[in-house]
């Protein structure tokens, strides 16, 4: 192999290594910004296709209905705890902040936060359903069977 071919080979290897390093760093940086969507049942039992359950400390978005009678407000702060449910289960959520004006029991919400031990969500953001005609597609798909069932049938299997 002559010197010219060797130099081209080294340059090609260096470009490929640089490209691989760049892709790896971009994916690592984006990893902290990716929030996966789950329903309460998927947190308890895993995603349907893969049966993969979220890990403690994982950032995620959870969509469900606010269970009637579950909203508890701390009178000395802005801390609120409530339960969201779907056809397969329920999870507890705690949130520190001002809730959206449209937030109420029996209404659809999407919470964004971290999963803690005991299937508890520490929410950083709470989004309430905007009006009667719009539901995010993920929530609508997960909630289509819930409107006819009473909230009392949704219990956490761990309790």
From Swiss-Prot:
Any GO MF annotation of the entry: heme binding
Subcellular location field: Cell inner membrane
Cross-referenced InterPro entries: CcmE, CcmE-like_sf, NA-bd_OB-fold
Record topology, Periplasmic segments: 30-159
Pfam families: CcmE (PF03100)
Positions of heme binding: 130, 134
Basic and acidic residues compositional bias, start-end: 132-147
GO BP of this protein: cytochrome complex assembly
SUPFAM superfamilies referenced in this protein's UniProt entry, alphabetically: Heme chaperone CcmE
Domain of life: Bacteria
Membrane topology, record value: Single-pass type II membrane protein
Cytoplasmic face residues: 1-8
The entry's keywords: Cell inner membrane, Cell membrane, Cytochrome c-type biogenesis, Heme, Iron, Membrane, Metal-binding, Signal-anchor, Transmembrane, Transmembrane helix
Region annotation (Disordered) ranges: 132-159
Ranges that cross the membrane: 9-29
GO CC annotation terms, alphabetical: plasma membrane
UniProt similarity note: Belongs to the CcmE/CycJ family.
Role played: Heme chaperone required for the biogenesis of c-type cytochromes. Transiently binds heme delivered by CcmC and transfers the heme to apo-cytochromes in a process facilitated by CcmF and CcmH.
Entry-linked NCBIfam families: PRK13150.1, PRK13165.1, PRK13254.1-1, PRK13254.1-3
Name of protein: Cytochrome c-type biogenesis protein CcmE
Native organism: Escherichia coli O8 (strain IAI1)
């Amino acid at each position: 192999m002559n010197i010219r071919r060797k130099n081209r080979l080294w340059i090609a290897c260096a470009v490929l290594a640089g490209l691989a390093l760049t892709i790896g760093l971009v994916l690592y940086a984006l990893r902290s910004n990716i929030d996966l969507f789950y329903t309460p049942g998927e947190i308890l039992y895993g995603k349907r296709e893969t049966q993969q359950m979220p890990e403690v400390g994982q950032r995620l978005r959870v969509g469900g209905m606010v269970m009637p009678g579950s909203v508890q407000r701390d009178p000395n702060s802005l801390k609120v705890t409530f339960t969201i449910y779907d056809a397969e289960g329920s999870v507890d959520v705690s949130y520190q902040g001002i809730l959206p004006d449209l937030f109420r029991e029996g209404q659809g919400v999407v919470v964004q936060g971290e999963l803690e031990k005991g299937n508890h969500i520490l929410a950083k953001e709470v989004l309430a359903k905007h009006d009667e005609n719009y539901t995010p597609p993920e929530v609508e798909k997960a909630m289509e069977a819930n409107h006819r069932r009473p909230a009392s049938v949704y219990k956490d299997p761990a309790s």
